[in-house]
Amino acid sequence: FDDYSSFVVTYPGFPEEAKLRIRAEQALEREGVELTRITAFFDRFPPLTNPGRARYALALAALGRSEAREVGRAAWRGGPMNDAVEASLLAQLAPVLQPSDHDARMDALLWASAGAQAERQLLYVSPGARTGFLVRLGLINGRDPAAAGLPQPTDLRAAPGPVEALGAG
């Protein structure tokens, strides 16, 4: 993280800066980095990846910064992240997350084909969206939803993800 982030800070606008920033964010998955260094980098260069956004949210919260909740909700809704970070973020945000936040996360997880995280997320989705999410998860996992006894919701035919998965898109 330090190598990439230091280079980006020293040479802002360097060609392919976005790739360097993404590599810095990916390094957070492998390295322990001081919270103040994480927040200093992301304060100047907002996260480009959802795992980076999630790490930023946790660092903000640990430092008691007011924007932690807003960044955390955006990360929650944004899709996949490291399992340990997911658990920490959920513990931090559970009191403020709304059904729409959980449904948005599930949609992002399904689009990213993050099956294991999507299966965990099923516990939190709204009852009205659950069947549609189960159908989409089945399609991602290569299972026929009808064989599992799941009805195909009429509004699902208009959703681009399931239509594409069925080969009709």
Model-predicted segments: where are they?
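Alpha-helical solenoid repeat scaffolds
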Residues: 1-169
